[in-house]
Amino acid sequence: MHNITPEQLYQVICKNVAKYRKAKGLSQLDLSLQMGYKSVSVVSGAEICYSNKHFNLEQLLKISQILNIEFCSFFKQEA
């Protein structure tokens, strides 16, 4: 992850959240509800980085616990 811009890092995180969520068979609504939100807007917007929306560290920690994956998994780039 050398020479990566903040925007590129956000894209990596967004793609990984969506990938791991889908792998666990959860919809955006399922994940949103388990995170304590009443709608999908936070998850759906952050998964596509819509209007500069991103997951914060607290949200990523909660998602990693819900999906039962390592926190650092969100930051891994595919080769």
Mark where each language-model region is.
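Residues within the helices of the helix-turn-helix
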Residues: 18, 29, 61
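Short C-terminal boundary/hinge segments that cap the last helix of small helical domains
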Residues: 67-79
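The alpha-helix within a helix-turn-helix
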Residues: 21, 32, 64
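A short, Lys/Arg-rich alpha-helix, primarily the initiator
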Residues: 1-24
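Residue-level detection of the helix-turn-helix DNA-binding "recognition helix"
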Residues: 22, 36, 48-49, 79
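Short, basic-rich loop-to-helix N-cap that marks the start of a DNA-contacting helix
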Residues: 50-65
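Recognition helix of helix-turn-helix/homeodomain-like DNA-binding domains
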Residues: 37-53
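Conserved hydrophobic/aromatic packing and binding residues within compact polymer-binding modules
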Residues: 17, 31-32, 42-47, 74
